[in-house]
């Protein structure tokens, strides 16, 4: 991604919380330590999409992580509705029909479409169990090439794949990496993880961080430490 980003803007805080009230309380605790937030299934289905406009009006960026995957017409209509909310990013699964529909439907709204290659909780054995013949690395590469040809704005990938993908897609596609864990943090249910500094060095543009921040005793201090690590890695 050619755009120069401030360290704080490269950290996306995942608001994986059960209610709008809990999310708003976390945002208040984080204050100016964070500028970019992710709303996923849990919060979205608890009314969290109502926060998108308010956050945008407050100068924050919002990543709506719904991983849309349906027939093209249905995805397109969903993207049209979501594009009016004021979000910065929206995820879809990296299937050609889904990606094409999303790119066409967002129009000139400014909404950036991110394609999810392979979930960071999956490894080769999970793909084999699901019936895939390709391993994680091969499937990620295949989907990345398809996404680039379709005009996708960014890819969601594990930090382990970032360096490899950067060599494939160049600098014009943003790489967004979940599975970020500061040194010493628990991996949780993620199988392909990396520290913030290593992920930046591998070529990631944006780092999604959830539990290490929202479950920390001092979320603001945890977020500030990650931003400092990003700043050092990009200096």
From Swiss-Prot:
- Provide the taxonomic classification: Bacteria, Pseudomonadati, Pseudomonadota, Alphaproteobacteria, Hyphomicrobiales
Family (UniProt) = Belongs to the OMP decarboxylase family. Type 1 subfamily.
Q: What does the protein in this record do?
A: Catalyzes the decarboxylation of orotidine 5'-monophosphate (OMP) to uridine 5'-monophosphate (UMP).
According to the UniProt entry, its GO molecular function terms are: orotidine-5'-phosphate decarboxylase activity
Look up the record and report any one GO term of the cellular component aspect: cytosol
Task: Say if the entry is tagged with keyword tRNA processing.
Answer: no
Q: Which residues form a coiled coil?
A: none
A Pfam family assignment: OMPdecase
Annotated active site: 67
Assembly and partners are described as: Homodimer.
Disulfide feature? none
What is the name of this protein?
Orotidine 5'-phosphate decarboxylase
Give the originating organism: Rhodopseudomonas palustris (strain BisB18)
| EC code | 4.1.1.23
Q: Which UniProt keywords apply?
A: Decarboxylase, Lyase, Pyrimidine biosynthesis
Extent of the signal sequence: none
Kindly state a single biological-process term from the GO annotations of this entry. Answer: 'de novo' pyrimidine nucleobase biosynthetic process
Q: Which gene encodes it?
A: pyrF
The family database entries (InterPro entries) matched by this protein are listed as: Aldolase_TIM, OMPdecase, OMPdecase_AS, OMPdecase_bac, OMPdeCOase_dom, RibuloseP-bd_barrel
Which reaction(s) does the protein catalyse, per the Swiss-Prot or TrEMBL entry? Answer: orotidine 5'-phosphate + H(+) = UMP + CO2
The record's section on SUPFAM superfamilies has: Ribulose-phoshate binding barrel (SSF51366)
Source organism, top-level taxon:
Bacteria
> Which biological pathway?
Pyrimidine metabolism; UMP biosynthesis via de novo pathway; UMP from orotate: step 2/2
Annotated residues that bind substrate are located at: 16, 38, 65-74, 120, 181, 190, 210-211
Q: Which PANTHER family match?
A: OROTIDINE 5'-PHOSPHATE DECARBOXYLASE (PTHR32119:SF2)
């Amino acid at each position: 991604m050619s755009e120069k980003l401030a360290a704080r803007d490269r950290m996306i805080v995942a608001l994986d919380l059960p209610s709008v009230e809990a999310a708003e309380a976390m945002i208040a605790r984080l204050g100016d330590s964070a500028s970019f937030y992710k709303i996923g299934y849990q919060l979205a289905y608890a009314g969290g999409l109502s926060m998108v406009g308010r956050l945008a009006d407050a100068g924050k960026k919002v990543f709506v992580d719904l991983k849309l995957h349906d027939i093209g017409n249905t995805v397109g209509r969903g993207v049209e509705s979501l594009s009016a909310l004021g979000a910065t990013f929206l995820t879809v699964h990296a299937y050609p029909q889904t990606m094409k529909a999303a790119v066409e439907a967002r129009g000139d709204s400014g909404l950036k479409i991110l394609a999810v290659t392979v979930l960071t909780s999956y490894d080769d054995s999970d793909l084999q169990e699901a019936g895939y013949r390709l391993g994680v690395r091969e499937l990620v590469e295949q989907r990345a090439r398809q996404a680039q040809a379709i005009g996708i704005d960014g890819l969601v990938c594990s930090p382990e794949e970032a360096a490899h993908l950067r060599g494939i897609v160049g600098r014009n596609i943003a790489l967004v990496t979940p599975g970020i864990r500061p040194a010493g943090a628990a991996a949780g249910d993620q199988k392909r993880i990396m520290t913030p500094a290593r992920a930046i060095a591998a070529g990631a543009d944006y780092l999604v961080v959830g539990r290490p921040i929202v479950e920390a005793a001092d979320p603001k201090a945890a977020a500030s430490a990650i931003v400092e690590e990003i700043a050092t890695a990009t200096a």
